[in-house]
Amino acid sequence: FFARSKTTSLTLQDADDIRALPTVRLVIPRQQRSMRMIYKKEFTTTRVYGVTPEWQAARSWELSDGEFFTDQDMQRKRRVIVLGATPAKKLFGDKDPIGKMVRVGDASYQVLGLLVEKGLTESGYDPDDRTLIPLTTSMSRLTHQTHIHSAKVMALDPSMVEKTMEDVRQL
């Protein structure tokens, strides 16, 4: 389930507090913003998510090439990016983007990896139209906000979801 911030009060400390609950297996805090990305003369607008390295495992989303960012990238607030298939195709066509620099907002980011293409959903939603950067980089360089927009919370066991949701509400 997701814990969402209706105000600007959900923080990384809140995510840590949720993570410490005995029924919680994983917490993935995130920020989200729609941004224009540029590579040479090509450009696109896509969703940029600031997430933690655990995002990939929590979402069970494999990489088709390259690698995901690390805890060290988070600590250093590195300008690195993992591209979804849609922005990768729009910016690079059939060319290999790994190691290339793309512009997001007013800064350049090095492409580390490519997410496996999922394809359009039945409702027409494109889950591949996204990019991922370290959450700390998003907070300090992109959104300039100290709060997070939401956090994906995974209970230790499906039977614990209701209890976990109640515990999160109590915080």
Positions of predicted regions on the chain:
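Hydrophobic, regular-secondary-structure patches
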Residues: 1-47, 51-57, 89-90, 139-140, ...
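Mid-to-C-terminal secondary-structure elements
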Residues: 49-73, 77-171
